[in-house]
Amino acid sequence: MIQTNPADKVELPRIEKYSGNVYSQKQLEELFNIFKGNPAEFGVVTAAFYGLRRSEVVGLKWDAVDFEKKTITIKHTIQQTKVDGKLQIVPCDRTKTKSSCRTLPLVAPYEEILLKMRENQEENRKLCGSCYCTDYLDYIYVNEIGEIIKPDYLTTHFKAFLEEHNMPHIRFHDLRHSCATLLFAQGVPMKEIQAWLGHSTIGTTANIYTHLDENSKINSANAIIGILEQKRTLRAFHLRVSF
């Protein structure tokens, strides 16, 4: 009988984590411009500014917005899953983790977007009459006839639209990465970025969402050069003193 398991000595391959791409501030501004008036515009702006997950974007409800206190609470999601081989919409009154439930400030530009969304919904409901879908009246992100915007729609439409406009390829989820990276570049503390994104651990924030852009790398290189130049100057000074 073998006393030890030979497999215990086998070194398993390391799991490589996917490293997404990110957009710079300039690229995000260009992105917002090309999506103006597009059905996916609200999803793109929300994911990029608030760093929301796809399920959180489509799961936003009106009761999560407090126009008086100027806050928006991320507490609902919508999942899309297969049931008997068919994709089904599954609303959830909970987020991915406990820490994912978070309250964020409702800034003026985004408040204007929400007010316009609500106005459009009211107008569409009057125009459509009995044809208007009443299943998702509590939700913010619906189409002209009141149907919820499906998570898969955001993914596929986003990809196709980028290709159509010759924009660098990123996933819809990479808008969340871009949000975190821009916050990091602006000097926002990692703990605050963690709270903004709703991560359960700060390690997730640090390891996944702090993609350094080229400018950050150049700044780091210049800092090293500065240190080396300083040391060279000091060394020369010491040499002169020794004479």
Residue ranges and their predicted role:
Residues 2-62, 67-68, 99-101, 135, ...:
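Basic, Lys/Arg- and aromatic-enriched nucleic-acid-binding interface segment
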Residues 21-22, 56-59, 149, 170, ...:
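Gram-positive cell-envelope targeting signals
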Residues 33-38, 50, 104, 120-130, ...:
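Short, basic (Lys/Arg/His-rich) helix/loop patches that form interaction surfaces
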